[in-house]
């Protein structure tokens, strides 16, 4: 009820604590606790599974409440200040500036499940946009603008690197890398996106 979605990533990952952002304290400007949306995601997943197992509609209602909060993190516009597509992707938390995060491929499946349980078309639309956004950062011919950024930052890239995928956009340690970030693993980028795609067939 407090909107307190704090976890490890909120304070001890790449968006660290500082005097204006302390664990357990509300943000002075917004009056909210600092939030990371993974706790919201896992809560929506847990409530969904509780409903499926029990048939008790209260679990579904609680899950939809959590999903409503998660929806606040979905990018519903093309940000004019970013050179990559943004519509449908997900940010990470209230106190960093990462966009198009790989978690959107997981969120896509959660929205799809809620659509199947409720028939709510807005969940289906959010699921499809989140899935589409899961491929925005992939290095491939279909993403010409993103491909050009990769090749500018990594001049050695060529067709053998097609399918490469950064974790998100604008995730960096201060090193100027055109917003590409410096972290990727198969299951948090291209692998997560590819694994979610067949679920929509």
Regions found by a protein language model. Name each.
Residues 1-201:
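Glycan-recognition and catalytic cores of secretory/periplasmic carbohydrate-active enzymes
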């Amino acid at each position: 009820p407090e909107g307190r979605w704090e976890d490890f990533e909120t304070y001890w990952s790449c968006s660290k604590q500082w005097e204006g952002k302390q664990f357990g304290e509300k943000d002075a400007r917004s009056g909210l606790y600092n939030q990371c949306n993974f706790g919201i995601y896992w809560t929506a997943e847990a409530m969904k599974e509780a409903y499926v197992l029990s048939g008790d509609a209260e679990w579904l209602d609680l899950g939809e409440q959590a999903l409503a909060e998660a929806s606040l993190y979905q990018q519903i516009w093309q940000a004019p200040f970013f050179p990559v597509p943004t519509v449908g992707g997900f940010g990470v938390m209230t106190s960093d500036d990462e966009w198009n995060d790989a978690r959107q491929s997981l969120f896509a499946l959660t929205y799809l499940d809620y659509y199947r349980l409720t028939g709510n078309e807005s969940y289906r639309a959010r699921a499809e946009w989140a899935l589409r956004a899961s491929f925005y950062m992939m290095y491939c011919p279909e993403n010409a603008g993103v491909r050009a950024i990769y090749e500018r930052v990594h001049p050695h890239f060529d067709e053998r690197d097609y399918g490469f995928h950064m974790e998100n956009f604008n995730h960096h340690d201060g090193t100027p890398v055109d917003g590409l970030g410096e972290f990727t693993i198969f299951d948090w980028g291209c692998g997560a996106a590819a694994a979610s795609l067949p679920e929509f067939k």
